[in-house]
């Protein structure tokens, strides 16, 4: 591993020099989305994290929801009805994006919608200042303000999960 990769890995859990894969989980309940105020990034974000080499995106989403929010969640989306030896279908992310982290590093984000199944919301104090459920109206009042992209995903998740459907068909649980 070169020195740049090593320093990125030790500070931000990056496992690749230029691009890492991440998961964001927009957990919705009663018309509100669960957000964390991230200590290191100083931003309001959904639950989420990096996909490690031995994990698939669903595993990461479930793990991060528990670690960062104290919740067991059900992922919402479509799982293809594929079968066969050596094949396991995954719920497709609702959206994908790529966002710049630094001049030399980007994240490909897999964006999931979810509902809580079990657990009590809890703050991961080492990583976050705050955790809270926010309505669409409350998104505008958060300090520091969230990015327009995160706000858009929040609004879309609240609307689609509350309505119980998304383009392309009904949401199905994991």
List each model region and its residues:
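Acidic, metal-coordinating catalytic segment for phosphate/diphosphate chemistry
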Residues: 2-25, 30, 87-90
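Short secondary-structure capping micro-motifs at structural edges
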Residues: 13, 62, 97-101
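Short connector loops at helix/strand junctions that flank enzyme active sites
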Residues: 20, 28, 46, 68, ...
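Nudix hydrolase/Nudix homology domain
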Residues: 39-44, 105-111, 115-174
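Active-site segment of metal-dependent pyrophosphate-handling enzymes
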Residues: 70-118
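Residues embedded in well-ordered beta-strands
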Residues: 24-26, 32-34, 111-113
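Short secondary-structure boundary/capping segments
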Residues: 17, 25, 100-104, 122-124
